[in-house]
Amino acid sequence: GPGPGSLTLSLLRSGSDVIGIEIDSEAILHLERIFGNADGKLEIIQGDVLKVKWPNNLSHIVANLPYQISSPVLDLIQQYHYRSPLKAIVILVQDEFAERMSMEYFGSLSPLGLSLWLDFDVKLDKKVPGGAFSPAPRVNSRLVTLIPVDRSIENGAINRKMFRIITHHCFSSRRKKIKTLLSKTPRRISRVTGWHKSRWKSAIEDLISNPPDGFSENWFDNRPDMLEPEEWAIIANRISSYEE
């Protein structure tokens, strides 16, 4: 979303090749009047960022994300990074949303933050007051940097699909105990080949009676946000490896 082009100008001045995705036709005309093609350094793709095909040669993503689509855009960024690794992502989002992304504070784990944790270290940067924008929103924004990491645990690569299913399932009722939450079969478990209600029930019984190494005896009496991301990864891998 290049919009009026302020960020685009700064990126071009850095010597970067810039690709912008802009849905507004008037904004595109404005950008063309101001920049032209910037000596071949600027390409504007017209369309909805949630629907158009992204170029396959991106190295960095720098954007001021609209609040209402921040979550789906982040999901697309993560999908893109999984296919074609990015070097860094710097975005501006709503302050509260940024805290959910980073999980920096005790008890702040969330499905959003845990999903991002699979691929990135999330670093909070400067707050930006609403008055910095026109029209001014009623909330503050926050700069966030996503630094790619190669995430794994002791017993190998993390089962990403199972990890996401389990964390979404448990954090949908985050005030309940983990044992209570895991006793119910996730609605999306059938999306994983070979998984069904009876296999899930047996896997959870095995997990509860034989805790993973390093887990406390009554770990399952905690609420979901009391565990570390690494522990959720261990749980996901332990469940996914269970054979009836």
Regions found by a protein language model. Name each.
Residues 1-169, 231-244:
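Catalytic cores of RNA-modifying enzymes
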Residues 142, 146-150, 154-211, 219-230:
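An accessory alpha-helical subdomain
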